[in-house]
């Protein structure tokens, strides 16, 4: 395997500016090519396994060197033309240059290797539930805003490895109904003269533009994130409501703090309604500016259907506990099948929305939602439940949650994860030798085509007291 071009490489070792010829042997977890030279790992964004390229080293990152391609010397049979013209610059979707079947194969192999390495788990996976659309799947976008030195508004995601905006007029992974609004909204905000600087210098003005759509209803909610009240937005908001019938509401979210957290605590209505309707698994939900809701609605419905189907095969004498329940996207479909469900969630606003959604769908009598620390609430609810569903944030289950589960293990446990590494870590503890559980099934779900992300559902069954 060629490693250098033999012209600049020497025994002095790697340094910024050094030119090499390398061949990628794998992709890292961010979807960038990985090569080796003189014992060093070299990251080559844009290079696929098996491809050779002339590269230039840029900077050292701990035990790795970041490089950029000067010239790609050959092409993998799995390479394709990216569907987005900004794919090489934008840091949002790092696998667009890889055919989608190859994306899925790589993701499933990543899942297998991660489970084996971090969890000691060598278990067959079911084929990933895939989104055949590939594009246009995102029901929400939060897009940074900034005025350039020429005073023109830039709107787009960050350039790879930086906080510089890649100016865009469309985004192919956005729902096409939202994508059609991106350019006219940018033009309106540009001509408004309002200052804009997402979070670089934290100057006053616009920070982000938020777009959200009900996949099944077509209703749209526009949100402008700003550091302060901007009276000029009131006029724009009314114009948007009148211009586009699907736009049911325009809100202003205030984020005055110096933080990377996009949304602030205060949201006000500029025009129309504060929420939009969505139909999810046949149930009606209300989505606001700050509601946490899965980005890919059809894929979320498929994974919830898997959970409902698996739990419905068992004779459950007690209730199902849904930990990290959010607004009830798993709890309510389970209740609709006749189960009694107890939802646990630390965010009181989400609990309020879950209760409202339950009442709106006639499921209030079969659901109970509690706000508070999940570990503490589990200690009070596990003794009487027959099954547990957990859908934690990316950091995975807190140690106290795992201890609560192992102290009083329910008969069935469904663990949905958005981070395979933390899930593998947690499963290692839940599946410890002489422990109460055995792993029954791994079901990966590709929520985010063109990216490295893969969600995974693990089904565990209790085998001992």
Curated annotation (Swiss-Prot):
It comes from the Bacteria. Its EC number is 2.1.1.-. [4Fe-4S] cluster binds at residues 84, 90, 93, 171. PROSITE patterns: SAM_MT_RNA_M5U, TRAM, TRMA_1, TRMA_2. Disulfide bonds: none annotated. Residues 13-71 form the TRAM domain. It is an enzyme of class 2 (transferase). InterPro entries: Methyltranfer_dom, MeTrfase_TrmA_AS, MeTrfase_TrmA_CS, NA-bd_OB-fold, SAM-dependent_MTases_sf, TRAM_dom, U5_MeTrfase_fam. CDD domains: AdoMet_MTases (cd02440). Pfam families: Methyltransf_31. S-adenosyl-L-methionine binds at residues 294, 324, 345, 391. The active site is at 418 (nucleophile). Keywords: 4Fe-4S, Iron, Iron-sulfur, Metal-binding, Methyltransferase, S-adenosyl-L-methionine, Transferase. The keyword Thylakoid does not apply. GO terms for molecular function: 4 iron, 4 sulfur cluster binding; metal ion binding; rRNA (uridine-C5-)-methyltransferase activity. One of its GO terms (biological process) is rRNA base methylation. Belongs to the class I-like SAM-binding methyltransferase superfamily. RNA M5U methyltransferase family. This is Uncharacterized RNA methyltransferase SYNW1228.
């Amino acid at each position: 395997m060629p490693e250098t071009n033999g012209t600049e490489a020497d025994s002095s070792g790697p340094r910024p500016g050094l030119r090499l010829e390398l061949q990628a042997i794998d992709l890292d977890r961010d979807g960038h090519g990985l090569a080796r030279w003189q014992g060093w790992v070299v990251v080559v964004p844009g290079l696929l396994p098996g491809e050779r390229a002339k590269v230039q080293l840029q900077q050292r990152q701990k035990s790795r060197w970041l490089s950029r391609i000067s010239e790609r010397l050959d092409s993998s049979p799995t390479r394709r033309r990216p569907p987005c013209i900004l794919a090489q610059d934008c840091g949002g979707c790092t696998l667009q240059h890889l055919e989608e079947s190859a994306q899925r194969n790589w993701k499933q192999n990543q899942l297998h290797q991660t489970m084996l390495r971090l969890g000691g788990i060598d278990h067959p996976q079911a084929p990933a539930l895939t989104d055949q659309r590939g594009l246009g799947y995102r029901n929400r976008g939060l897009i940074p805003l900034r005025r350039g030195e020429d005073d023109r508004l830039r709107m787009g995601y960050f350039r790879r490895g930086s906080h510089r905006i890649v100016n865009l007029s469309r985004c192919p992974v956005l729902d096409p109904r939202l994508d059609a609004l991106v350019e006219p909204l940018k033009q309106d905000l540009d001509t408004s003269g309002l200052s804009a600087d997402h979070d670089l210098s934290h100057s006053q003005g616009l920070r982000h533009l938020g777009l959200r759509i009900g996949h099944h209803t077509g209703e749209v909610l526009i949100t402008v994130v700003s550091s302060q009240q901007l009276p000029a937005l009131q006029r724009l908001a009314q114009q948007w409501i009148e211009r586009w019938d699907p736009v049911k509401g325009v809100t202003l979210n205030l984020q005055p703090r110096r933080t990377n957290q996009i949304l602030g605590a205060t949201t006000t209505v500029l025009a129309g309604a504060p929420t939009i309707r969505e139909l999810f698994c046949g149930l009606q939900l209300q989505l606001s500016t700050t509601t946490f809701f899965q980005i890919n609605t059809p894929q979320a419905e498929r994974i919830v259907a898997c959970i409902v189907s698996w739990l419905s095969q068992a004779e459950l004498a007690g209730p199902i506990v849904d930990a990290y329940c959010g607004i009830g996207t798993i709890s309510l479909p389970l209740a609709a099948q006749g189960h009694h469900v107890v939802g646990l969630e630390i965010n009181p606003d989400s609990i309020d929305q879950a209760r409202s959604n339950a009442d709106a769908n006639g499921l209030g009598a079969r659901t109970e939602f509690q706000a508070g620390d999940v570990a503490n609430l589990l200690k009070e609810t596990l003794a009487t439940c027959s099954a547990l569903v957990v859908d934690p944030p990316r950091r995975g289950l807190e140690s106290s949650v795992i201890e609560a589960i192992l102290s009083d293990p329910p008969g069935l446990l469904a663990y949905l994860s958005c981070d395979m590494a933390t899930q593998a870590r947690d499963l290692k503890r839940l599946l410890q030798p002489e422990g109460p559980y055995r792993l029954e099934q791994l079901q990966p779900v590709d929520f985010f085509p063109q990216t490295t992300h893969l969600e995974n559902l693990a089904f565990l069954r209790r085998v001992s007291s």
